[in-house]
Amino acid sequence: TPEDVAAAIRADGGAPDDRVLGDVQAAADYVLSLPSSNGKVGVWGTCSGGRHAFLAGCKLTVFDAVVECWGGNVIMAQDQLTEKQPVSPNEYTNDLNAPILGLFGDLDQSPTKEQVDQHEAELKSAGKDYEFHRYPEAGHGFFYYHAPIYHQASAVDGWEKMFDFFSRKLN
């Protein structure tokens, strides 16, 4: 099952950044090849997928918009780096190629409020086009309607902000 595959990858220390970037590039190339494509493409993700979306926006040039939902490990300490994830994604902030929307719960522990502050300060310092929204009553994974961490008001607002952002940046 997909859950079994995800568990096996997590148990093995996560997916290598290079493999993720290759997969994301291939997906974007496919979307852009479709007859219905307008030539623009966005990327988004939650949790480690938020990390991957930010990383893709920095390392790949194909994206016109990036949405990072509570991206865990965008800011990594030296002792968190591994062979599969050798660089903290925030080290690539200057290379961000697209506008970014960030959605974060203030009760989250990955990323913490302080990490979100640092992430935002780095984007601002680099002169990047960014928009961050924080939800004081939400924690990690507040979109996940099937889980106890779901926070409806934050999720509804976040989805609206995401659809609006993509509409503005991809049309």
Predicted regions and their residues:
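N-terminal cap/leader regions of alpha/beta-hydrolase-fold enzymes
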Residues: T1-N171
